[in-house]
Amino acid sequence: MEGPMSSDTNTRAPVPPFTLESAIQKVRMAEDAWNTRNPEQVSLAYTIDGVWRNRSEFLIGREAIVQFLTRKWDKELDYRLIKELWAFHGTRIAVRFAYEWRDEEGSWFRSYGNENWEFADSGLMRRRIASINDIPITEQDRKYFWPIGRRPDDHPGLSELGL
């Protein structure tokens, strides 16, 4: 992204340029943070002036991110997410993901998506571009059953689950 970016002095390792190992670590850190469903905690991984496109919504800044995530997790109940590294280069990482959730009526969904991430030198994400599709599923179609929170290390990832 061109132009001045955040003057945020916080650093969040690993920092770019990414290696295979550090990119995988960054993806798992993001998955773990999102599985907390804590908007304030999640927002700290982004620059103060971070830019997002999530589906058709455009956001700028941590406060907008917190507000968005609060709305999201008020709607998406019993949220469980798995992310997987797709590609990386320099300051950028691409991931694919799938998460399961239910609405207030008890209907279940699996949401599939791709994200493109760009990081500042500090290791904070300064740009996130996400494309997501929601697919209705039955209770019997669910694949994510770990307790709410971090996915256990021995739980299969997306590729292992055939997603």
Short names for language-model regions:
Residues 51-70:
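Short solvent-exposed beta->alpha transition segments
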Residues 19-35:
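Short, aromatic-enriched amphipathic alpha-helices that serve as compact interaction elements
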Residues 2-18, 67-163:
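A beta-strand edge to alpha-helix "cap/lid" segment located at domain peripheries
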Residues 36-49, 53, 117:
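Short, well-ordered alpha-helical segments enriched in acidic and aromatic residues
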